[in-house]
């Protein structure tokens, strides 16, 4: 940072230094903030307004968590005003000991953003200590022969205060023999020396008592005293003399204990006992006496304890040499301790944010720390470094203060925490280092969406499953932590109707298990697709979708249903006519059945259960075709009955039965008298009356129902077909996945409008547009047959005369044996049949059979036996044609004729059928009817 920081002092006895120019938005200050306070300031006293000096408002004090930190915290910050307050007793002599300049270094830390400011509090000395002598009484022995002006060094007083409050001067009590002289020590201190002014005379006065007073420079001054007791002895007039007054020695702090550092030497010109010299410490501090030892006979000085430059840089000792005659002299020994690189750097964490958001950008401060090396010079210069492979770096904010900041993007899913090792190395030789490891936890952010184990799921569920059972399970994982990684599942879309989705499936929000809410029916619902969503609990939440396709497998739960032969409108069995001259291989009729199942479960086989003449007819195993085995014999009955069983290929197989009534006749006139003329019983009068009453009642009821039905249909239809009166079909399907109820509840629903012209002589009917929505809950095929028969039955009795004029069968109806349809498109008449190549072929075959059944009421096929019809009247059964699946038309045979559905398709397409007698066939059929 550029610029300079000036200082100002507070008014009053407390001197406080403030910065005149303080940068507000820099991470660190160019110079530390300085305050000056006297020692022994009362607790709670205000040092200065730290918030103001830092440029912070009162609101910022608590918002940015202004605080101070130090190794020993003597100060605190008022959270309301931002004042820096005295927290603990401040004793300058205890804190700074002998240092003349006493400063306390603090760090002011603020958050949001994290920053640090340096504070120096100068502790000013207060005159709270009086000078003090180590001994309250000083005993001296002075020979009477001592010459005038002889000086005797006295013990110095100690005053912990500094500057003006330190020791200022000495005073001696008034006397006529001695005066006091103050001399300066090399270290700047003062010591007193007692100077003889008058010759002593032991015989006159053998002892002298004086008072030595030490005064400091305080206001008011403080003092300390010591009693001096001087004993006058006989003359030993030559005191010992040191070779030099001051001895200086430089000593490395790493010298081991027991090392000799210096030998002092004193000589005495006296002889005898007065020349024997002993050495001793005189007025030496206890600390120095613990570190050094003195040989009292040789004057050799040894180390007793390890030296520590960081604790004491210099030792000053007074050595006294005394002869046996009690004469003494003193010298000074100054030991300079030379610093060695014996202290490793220290790392002190001042602030640490151990929780770091993983979306923190580079440059975010996560920790503040400082280094300290007690060595001096290059031994105390410290460099910091980080362990490798961590996305952090160190910024030096000021002298020995550092910031640990992010250097790269963080990813908790890859590394949830970092053990960052900070290494500090000094520049000594050899260098010393230390390290500190801090753990930084990365706080999770919802930055990962759930991921499904599969891109899509496919599950097969058999139909008629247990409701409530699980059918599938989806699983998604989220690498985030806690709520951000907690996944819940839900259904969000489906190809089913949304309002009925909950009645089909549900999903467990916790486990992802999909449950079936109902039993599925393959015939109604073969497949459906769900869209499931996995969502975590983060804010904002993240989600992922996956599709689940459910295939409903078929089970053999539907028995075959016989479409032909069907019962008549009055419940009587219909019959087929067979020419008497029918030859072996002649196609008599065909049993038509369907199975709503699929696959093997819908592969039908036909079996003869019972026959009037077992050897007269054969039944195709797969086709259901009834053919002549031999010609009709004279002994054979004209009326034949066959009981046919239709079985599917399921395990176990299901079956249905149908009864065929066959009449051998060359014309319809031979058959009708047997069915229309009944012998009258003897009591026919009463029976006739009963039947008449019942018939009249039924006719009245039917008439009323017909009128009501006609009115209702008129109201529901938006228009009336021009062809005549129409009846709405009940064969229709509902929208959605619900299957059709027609025939055997299969999957090929159709709905038609059934219209009959008003001309009873031309009972042709057509199918028009399909109806979209109408319920179908019963077997409508039989209803259609009954309706058709009820409409056409009156014409049978009315046209008996026309029947007698029936034209002979048209030879164009006949097909050769090779032209007759076989199974699966073959024309060789093989009854074994072939299995469809795939499921599509099977479904197409079922569609063909259902379509052929639906053609029972198709208006495009005339009742007169035109091309494409079965050649039967309304009384004898429904008409079967095929117009939806042309590939399978040849598999459906039209009983009573040699035509196939291909002819009917040609007629619908506007093409003339094979043969030129189409009109004659139609008129002939009308005459038969």
UniProtKB/Swiss-Prot annotation:
Topological region Extracellular: 31-691
Keywords: Calcium, Cell adhesion, Cell membrane, Glycoprotein, Membrane, Repeat, Signal, Transmembrane, Transmembrane helix
Segments forming domain Cadherin: 31-133, 134-242, 243-347, 348-452, 453-562, 570-675
Glycan-modified residues: 419, 545
PROSITE patterns: CADHERIN_1, CADHERIN_2
Compartments where located: Cell membrane
Source taxon at top rank: Eukaryota
A GO MF label: calcium ion binding
GO biological process: homophilic cell adhesion via plasma membrane adhesion molecules; nervous system development
Taxonomic lineage of the native organism: Eukaryota, Metazoa, Chordata, Craniata, Vertebrata
Stretches that traverse the bilayer: 692-712
InterPro entries for the chain: Cadherin-like_dom (IPR002126), Cadherin-like_sf (IPR015919), Cadherin_C (IPR032455), Cadherin_CBD (IPR031904), Cadherin_CS (IPR020894), Cadherin_N (IPR013164), Protocadherin/Cadherin-CA (IPR050174)
Protein purpose: Potential calcium-dependent cell-adhesion protein. May be involved in the establishment and maintenance of specific neuronal connections in the brain.
Organism for this UniProt entry: Pan troglodytes (Chimpanzee)
Topological relation to the membrane, as annotated: Single-pass type I membrane protein
Protein's UniProt name: Protocadherin gamma-B7
Predominant subcellular localization, coarse grouping: membrane
Segments of skewed composition (Basic residues): 919-929
Cytoplasmic topological segments: 713-929
Region (Disordered): 806-838, 899-929
Stretches with biased composition (Polar residues): 807-838
GO annotations of cellular component type: plasma membrane
Signal sequence region: 1-30
């Amino acid at each position: 940072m550029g610029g300079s920081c000036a200082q100002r002092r507070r008014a009053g006895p407390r001197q406080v230094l403030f910065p005149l120019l303080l940068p507000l938005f820099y991470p660190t200050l160019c110079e530390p903030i300085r305050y000056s306070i006297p020692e022994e300031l009362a607790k709670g006293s205000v040092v200065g307004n730290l918030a103001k000096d830092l440029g912070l408002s009162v609101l910022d004090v608590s918002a940015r968590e202004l605080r101070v930190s130090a190794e020993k915290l003597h100060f605190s910050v008022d959270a309301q005003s931002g004042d820096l307050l005295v927290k603990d007793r401040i004793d300058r002599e205890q804190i700074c000991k002998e240092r003349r300049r006493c400063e306390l270094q603090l760090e002011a830390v603020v958050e949001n953003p994290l920053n640090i400011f340096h504070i120096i509090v100068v502790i000013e000395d207060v005159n709270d200590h009086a000078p003090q002598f180590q001994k309250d009484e000083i005993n001296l022995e002075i020979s009477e022969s001592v010459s005038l002006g002889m000086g005797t060094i006295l013990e110095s007083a100690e005053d912990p205060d500094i500057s003006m409050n330190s020791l200022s001067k000495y005073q001696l009590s008034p006397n006529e023999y001695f005066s006091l002289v103050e001399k300066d020590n090399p270290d700047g201190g003062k010591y007193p020396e007692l100077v003889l002014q008058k010759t002593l005379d032991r015989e006159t006065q053998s002892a002298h008592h004086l008072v030595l007073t030490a005064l400091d420079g305080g206001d008011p001054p403080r003092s300390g005293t010591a009693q001096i007791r001087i004993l006058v002895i006989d003359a030993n007039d030559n005191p010992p003399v040191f070779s030099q007054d001051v001895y200086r020695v430089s000593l490395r702090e790493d010298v081991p204990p027991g090392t000799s550092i210096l030998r002092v030497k004193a000589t005495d010109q006296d002889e005898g006992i007065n020349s024997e010299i002993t050495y001793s410490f005189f007025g030496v501090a206890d600390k120095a006496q613990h570190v050094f030892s003195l040989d009292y006979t040789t004057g050799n000085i040894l180390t007793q304890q390890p030296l520590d430059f960081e604790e004491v840089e210099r030792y000053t000792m007074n050595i006294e040499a005394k002869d046996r005659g009690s004469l003494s002299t003193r010298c000074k020994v100054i030991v300079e301790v030379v610093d060695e690189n014996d202290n490793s750097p220290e790392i002190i964490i001042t602030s640490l944010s151990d929780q770091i958001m993983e979306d923190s950008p580079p440059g975010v401060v996560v920790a503040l720390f400082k280094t300290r090396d007690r060595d001096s010079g290059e031994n105390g210069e410290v460099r910091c470094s980080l362990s490798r492979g961590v996305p952090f770096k160190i910024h030096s904010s000021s002298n020995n203060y550092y910031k640990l900041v992010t250097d790269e993007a963080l990813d908790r899913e890859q590394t949830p925490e970092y053990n960052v090792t900070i290494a500090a190395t000094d520049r000594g030789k050899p260098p010393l280092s230390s390290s500190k490891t801090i753990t930084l936890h990365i706080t999770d952010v919802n930055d990962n969406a759930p991921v499904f184990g599969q891109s899509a799921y496919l599950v097969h569920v058999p139909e008629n499953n247990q409701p409530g059972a699980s059918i599938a399970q989806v699983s998604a994982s989220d690498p985030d932590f806690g709520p951000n990684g907690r996944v819940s599942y839900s259904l969000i879309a489906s190809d089913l109707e949304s309002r009925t989705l909950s009645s089909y499936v549900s999903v467990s929000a916790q486990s992802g298990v999909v449950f079936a809410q109902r039993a599925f029916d393959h015939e109604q619902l073969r497949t459906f697709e769900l869209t499931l969503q996995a969502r975590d609990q983060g804010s904002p939440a993240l989600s992922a979708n996956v599709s689940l396709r459910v295939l409903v497998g078929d089970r053999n739960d539907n028995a075959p249903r016989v479409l032909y032969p069907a019962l008549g409108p009055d419940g009587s069995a219909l019959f087929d006519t067979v020419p008497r001259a029918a030859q072996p291989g002649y196609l008599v009729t065909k049993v038509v059945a369907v199975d709503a199942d699929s696959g093997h479960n819908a592969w039908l086989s036909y079996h003869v259960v019972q026959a009037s003449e077992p050897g007269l007819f054969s039944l195709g195993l797969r086709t259901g075709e009834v053919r002549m085995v031999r010609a009709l014999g004279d002994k054979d009955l004209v009326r034949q009955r066959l009981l046919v069983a239709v079985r599917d290929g399921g395990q176990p197989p299901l079956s249905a039965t149908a009864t065929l009534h066959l009449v051998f006749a060359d014309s319809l006139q031979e058959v009708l008298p047997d069915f229309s003329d009944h012998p009258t019983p003897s009591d026919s009068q009463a029976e006739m009356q009963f039947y008449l009453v019942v018939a009249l009642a039924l006719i009245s009821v039917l008439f009323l129902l017909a009128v009501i039905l006609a009115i209702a249909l008129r109201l529901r239809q938006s228009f009336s077909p021009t062809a005549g009166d129409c009846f709405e079909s009940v064969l229709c399907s509902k929208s959605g996945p619900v299957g059709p109820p027609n025939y055997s509840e299969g999957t090929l629903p159709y709905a038609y409008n059934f219209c009959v012209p008003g001309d009873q002589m031309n009972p042709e009917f057509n199918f028009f547009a399909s109806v979209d929505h109408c319920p179908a809950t019963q077997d409508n095929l039989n209803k259609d047959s009954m309706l058709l028969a009820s409409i056409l039955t009156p014409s049978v009795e009315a046209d008996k005369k026309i029947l007698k004029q029936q034209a002979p069968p048209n030879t164009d109806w006949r097909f050769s044996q090779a032209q007759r349809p076989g199974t699966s498109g073959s024309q060789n008449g093989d009854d074994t049949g072939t299995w469809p190549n795939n499921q599509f072929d099977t479904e197409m075959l079922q569609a063909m059979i259902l379509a052929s059944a639906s053609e029972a009421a198709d208006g495009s096929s005339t009742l007169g036996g035109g091309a494409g019809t079965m050649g039967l009247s309304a009384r004898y059964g429904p008409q079967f044609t095929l117009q939806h699946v042309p590939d399978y038309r040849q598999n459906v045979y039209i009983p009573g004729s040699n035509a196939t559905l291909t002819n009917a398709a040609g007629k619908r397409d506007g093409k003339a059928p094979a043969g030129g007698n189409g009109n004659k066939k139609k008129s002939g059929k009308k005459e038969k009817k």
